[in-house]
Amino acid sequence: MLDIKNPIEARKVIRKNEYRNQTAGTANKYVQGNLCILPSKYAMDFASFCQKNPKPCPLIGFGTKGDPSLKDLGDIDIRTDVPQYRIWEKGKIIDEPYDIKKYWNEDLTTFVLGCSMSFELPLIEAGIPIQHIENDTIVPMYRTSIDCEPAGQFSGKLVVSMRPLNSKDAIRSIQISSRFPAVHGAPIHLGDPSEIGIKDIMNPEYGDPPKAFKNNEIPVFWACGVTPQSVLQDSKPDFCITHAPGKMLITDKLNNDLAAL
């Protein structure tokens, strides 16, 4: 884990390519974001997709065409300020670079979506253990059987993140995360993973496998901002750039600024 509390300093380290791993727990009072960068011909459809699917795709920022800065979110250069990226062509990953300078062009538009890491600090402050933070791993994420609402070219399956919790902590996590609708809000499911199409809880499509569940723990599932990557596989736009799962954009916005209560 990158143990830096200030988001500006964290981005400086990432910008210099001195840190390439997951960002959970880094600058943990500040909002982290999922990334999707698209050619302008897809921008309106993707914005509509986010509007129709606010649980997995809560839009917290977007850029203007051809501009790599995101002034509303901080002194950000989207070409360098994420630990690792994914380059997509027609639904397939063709590269996973540590910066996107050679891929950037004047026709690209950046979208930043809220991330569940923003409510993990309130969970920890409430005494709720977060397994992937304790183990310095990437939260496990799963492609479900739940369809997103389609918009234009974009359609596909919902992705969820999972945290093992005991029943008491699961109830408390619902109460706490409900305060943060801009970063996925309350869980969409808890308990039997097969009910949402997950065949093997120990084999996530994204992130790292969870450690063994304790006897009193159940899986708790939140809608996840990696959903666009699932949608890209199905919708197959000509070109797209995303973050690598778990390796997020760290912004200057405070988590508490997104709290609804």
From Swiss-Prot:
Q: Where are the transmembrane segments?
A: none
Q: Which Pfam families does the entry link to?
A: D-Glu_cyclase
User: According to the UniProt entry, what is the EC number of this protein?
Assistant: 4.2.1.-
Q: Recite the UniProt keywords alphabetically.
A: Lyase
- GO molecular-function terms, A-Z: lyase activity
Per its UniProt record, what PANTHER family does this chain match? D-GLUTAMATE CYCLASE, MITOCHONDRIAL
HAMAP family attached to this UniProt entry: Hydro_lyase
Name the protein family: Belongs to the D-glutamate cyclase family.
Entry protein name: Putative hydro-lyase SAR11_0660
Specify the species.
Answer: Pelagibacter ubique (strain HTCC1062)
